[in-house]
Curated annotation (Swiss-Prot):
The keyword Magnesium applies. It holds the Pfam family GATase. UTP binds at S21, K200, T201, K202, P203, T204, Q205, K236. This is CTP synthase.
Amino acid sequence: MTSSRKVRPTKHIFVTGGVVSSLGKGLTAASLGQLLIARGLSVTMQKLDPYLNVDPGTMNPFEHGEVFVTEDGAETDLDLGHYERFLDRNLGLNANVTTGKVYSTVIAKERRGEYLGKTVQVIPHITDEIKARILSMGEPDAHGNAPDVVISEVGGTVGDIESQPFLEAARQVRHEIGRENCFFIHCSLVPYLATSGELKTKPTQHSVAELRGIGILPDALVLRCDREVPQGLKDKIAMMCDVDYEGVVSCPDSSSIYNIPDVLYREHLDTFIIRRLGLPFRDVDWSTWHDLLERVNNPRHELTVGIVGKYIDLPDAYLSVVEAVRAAGYANWTRTNIKWITSDDCETPSGAMKALSGLDAIVVPGGFGIRGIEGKIGAITFAREHKIPLLGLCLGLQCTVIEAARQAGLEQASSTEFDPAATQPVIATMEEQKAAVSGEADLGGTMRLGAYPATLEEGSLVAELYGTTEVSERHRHRYEVNNAYRAQIAEGSDLVFSGTSPDGHLVEFVEYPKEVHPYLVATQAHPEYKSRPTHAHPLFYGLVKTALELRVHP
């Protein structure tokens, strides 16, 4: 059956950045996507990353931040999390393109002889591969529907050597599909000098000059600053950078990232783009988003949620966890203040008491390696004994099981990840992961990745939270609960194994009954990846809701 939608060319919007990194290109792109969706357009997004890694899966969290996992099991840049949350749609493997992926594909083609003996070069072979991946995002889906708009964020900063092939590919895309079907947005810093009390435009002028030097004239500029950029300076930048006055947009720092679409709307960026690209549109329907902003900016309650992690020196390592906690807060009209707690501080009862006292709820997120594990277990013990609501994620479930096993008399309970010679390995390496763990197979892209189904026990707390006994969550792990110890742990502690894989083999959820603890739930999955600011994830929602109830009825 063919689609009834009118056939029109997909429009491509490229978002670049200049002057400095971490300007918020991803948030700008995601906010624009949300704004265009509110205009009735279908939008998809893509991140072009210039690093040589095939994906960020093997990168240090301190170096890269969070690895965001998609439904189809791709390990991707954290910006894809922003895209999914703002667009409220799932993205896949093709939404993250890295230099490593591109070169791997091109070299594999060369080895197969697909270039017919030609000298393989950055131009045209690398740029052609990048172009193909960009244009593929605009192809029709299984139902014959193509997106109206593809927004591609080019990682890095204009002027970086690594970014040049991607920028050249974007330039060629504009040439091939027509200027009327392509739009370039450049994000730039407008610094404020306190000594002179002035905003400086020169960095932006030089950044645009650098971009023009490689053949790209931006259609719009998003000016990042710690304050509003006055109209006079915007007009000056428009003149000096040869950009339409309407295309120069001020985007000052905001108290919440979810205010950014409204900022861009008030600057009329969407109107300018729609007119330039000849897109159909309707009046903005922001009923859902404005309800979110009301909850973000006018909360009725306030809670403090502790995140007990190993990588807290770089909060971006837990970006989706933080946003999932905040989304649960919004759903409960609550401002959730995040307190970062290094797991090492919770190794002793006195350390846990000092670090965790006064918290309304605790999240124990994922991680790898032995450092800080006893602290995570100590935090779980403290939460269990003091009836503090706690949610464990991935490694958080494994630590919850180890803590329960020690209650059940398995005093040496541990994981083969931390101690390959453990005498009571209540957490063990998954059979299909043993080659990777032993070094006989690649580490990259070989974990249990992506969405997997689970069956929940009828009448369990997790089944009540989800409202069903059949669920699907995203995963990223190599280790699992050792089934040889399940019965002993269940008999010797109050822990309930409340959800498993459909075949009953893999433990996916554990919990304590409500009469034992108000809310101590853990999952082998990463539910934070499926949370949306407008649709809080059930497990995070339950955590915040229980914490609020305990505030009222301790």
